[in-house]
Amino acid sequence: MKVKKETINVWGARVHNLKDVDVTIPRNSLTVITGLSGSGKSSLAFDTIYAEGQRRYIETFSAYARNFLGNIERPDVDKITGLSPVISIEQKTTNKNPRSTVGTTTEIYDYLRLLYARAGTAYSYLSGEKMVKYTEEQVLEMILDQYIDHRIFILAPLVRQRKGHYRELFESMRRKGYLYIRVNGEIKEIERGMKVDRYKNHNIDKLKVRGKDDERLKKSVQIAMRQGDGTLMIFDEHDNSIKNYSKRLMDPTTGLSYGEPAPNIFSFNSPEGACPRCKGLGVVNEIDINKVIPDDKLSIRDGAISPLGKYKNQMVFWQIDAILQKYDCNLKTPVCDVPQEAMDEILYGTMENLKIPKEVVHTSSDYFVTFDGIIKYLRDIMDNDDTSAGQKWAEQFLATNVCPECHGFRLKRESLSYKIGDRNISEVANLDLNELAEWLSNMAEGLSTNQKIIASEIIKELRTRVGFLLNVGLDYLSLNRQSATLSGGESQRIRLATQIGTRLVNVLYILDEPSIGLHQRDNQRLINSLKELRDLGNTVIVVEHDEDMMRAADWIIDIGPKAGRKGGQVVFQGTPEEMLHRDTITANYLNGIQSIQIPAQRRRPNGKAMVLHGCTGNNLKNVDVEFPLGVLTVVTGVSGSGKSTLVNETLQPILAHHFYRALKKPMPYSSIEGLEYLDKVVTVDQSPIGRTPRSNPATYTGVFSDIRTLFVGLPEAKIRGYKPGRFSFNVKGGRCETCGGNGYKTIEMNFMPDVMVPCETCHGKRYNRETLEVRYKGKSIADVLDMTIGQAVEFFENVPSILPKIKTLQDVGLDYIKLGQSSTTLSGGESQRVKLATELAKRDTGKTLYILDEPTTGLHFEDIRILMNVIEKLVDKGNTVIIIEHNLDVIKLADYIIDMGPEGGRNGGRVLVTGTPEQVADCKLGYTSKYLKLALAK
């Protein structure tokens, strides 16, 4: 292959399943890498190209610095040339810190803080009046103008609401020649030995009578300003009125003063700005009585008070019984029948000495004790228990509520009292980005000439950065939205917008499915943003399955032909136009030779339905919605329209609590009907099936237990007396003790990255020699774990206890992954299909509800076809499936559609139209109908 300076060249890539792959990627182009799930796309883009770019960057550091940067292994590749500095933008919500928001991540909030510090107008949080500040000259002029022929006193505030006798202060003032002092509003003559009550709060002001000439008045003002820390007060004897004057921002009526505004007083991550009650989080954790007493129909003896359980801690129950006896109740009385006064004492405690009879405690006399209450008991555990298990146990009884002091705005009262127009900084941060863009366009009208000059550059930067976010389809988000609540696709697009804002050039960007979670309406805006990144002088590589993205690319690399061991080859690289004339699975879907077929006849609902009333969570507008049962329902709508709020945050928690007593609270709703038609709910999301390398598809699906049972029943195992634990790599006995059942050892290299090498004893097989000697059909337990799902289906075809569970993994298109493959190496889409296969293998009654959130994430056209065939089988058995989805290939297969909108954020939250795909396509409401009509016409 001839080396060209204008290309990135990869020779002999063998990472994971790649088979000595050679590729050429044009520089300053938009390149899409596509192919089936598991074909090797991410192995090429992230584990080869990005990993090598990172390794070369790290190599420029000193050996000492490299020691702190973790393990950067050289990818298994012969050679890569033409690499630029590389930045990876993956589809992960990496920041779980509740202090991280869209505003802080994009740095837009930093500019907003600067804007309010430089152009905000301060108001008093006591009176609502505009805060003012004066120079000494201005104060002097106002005194001369307003107090002509008035007898006035000039006061310097010395003490404000502090305790003490202040004898030394009074004596110091007397020695300096001052005759009067104002104490708690009363003017007094200073006397020798004068003092006040040391245990009360006092206000003390030094007082000077106005002189007869202006020079003495000027000097008095200067002294008062200096000793009052920039503040003085004028007491007019004519009408006994007091006015406040200050060099600092001050409320002239109440005397309340603020410091000079600085950006950090608008930061909820700074002590200067954060609300003192919630420490800048906007929420506080409080004990939820509904979690402490989940079922008030039970008696206390039967476990009504959840933290106490049933009759265990005798002393506590004796104390509670003593309280109940006062109200003619006992431990067997249902909580709903216990008077509220008694429950208050049980929950919050009582200082009354409770009598516990000597017959109960088996002592010579009655026992008297006070009771602190259940709430204090829980608080003590949370505050004082050193064990994480104890604190975690107590936290299950907490509820997160809006902070009562800042009302969720996160900032101090002073910080919230600065306004531009009629909005404080938190109100602006709560606007969705469309509204924020409009506010930035109009806000300058209310600024003074000086403020406009100061703010112009800041406003320009803000408008530019907000514009980047709008261009990637995030108009429904607000700056205050927590980063932890964003989907992977949203997080990725935020990072993309941030990178466009940096205006870097000659950089290689690698993105992982940026179209995830994006409605067709916003696809073109995303593509334009990627082209803008390219046009700045960068190379953009996108791992993607989206048809529009492929057609818009400058270059396509198709990895295949299939997945796993049957993939890992470049089946095509070239332009989109050239690809249309090739015979690959991807090309056949693009040119229309293959397609996901629309069903000839759609299912009709079984006449039963689940109906939700009055949903008002997040942006939902008092939504009433019907979910017909026995059909495939797809919930659609633009990003931010309320789909996840309706299904994942309202419906799913209601069902989880109903069937499994789950504690997660649903979003607000009025009522629900139709639960009696279901017997369970299954939520299949894309979270990992395990977070350690020891977790794998075999352990998650439960088939590993069946495989171990099979091995235990073999003659050789019986002779040796082996039990199922012998074939587990997690416990001592059968595992290799050299590596602890990991199959590898970690070698510390001091000033070099740690190296993971196969265990020299078991050679990566995880088990000891004796265990591996037990074989079934010539294969050891380690050999079985190393099989792909496809191989395992053939191997266990005559074992009815094992085959069904493995066959369902094959049915969902996972025949290429290994039975013992570490869960940490599975993609989100693969993890979701492992979960789906696990549920498929279980016996169902035809009354199960399955909820899936964007199951097509990471899936190729062919993968979607296989997945939907499996889902169709579930529905054919009488079950109900609800899917949140943007992919038109899924939407067109629905029996029933619920389309939400019309926009995202505040302008969404309504059910626009419901019905079959044909009915929705014929409707002119919303954006989904337009694109669905085109999909149905293909």
Roles of regions detected by a PLM:
Residues 1-938:
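Conserved phosphate-binding elements of NTP-dependent enzyme cores
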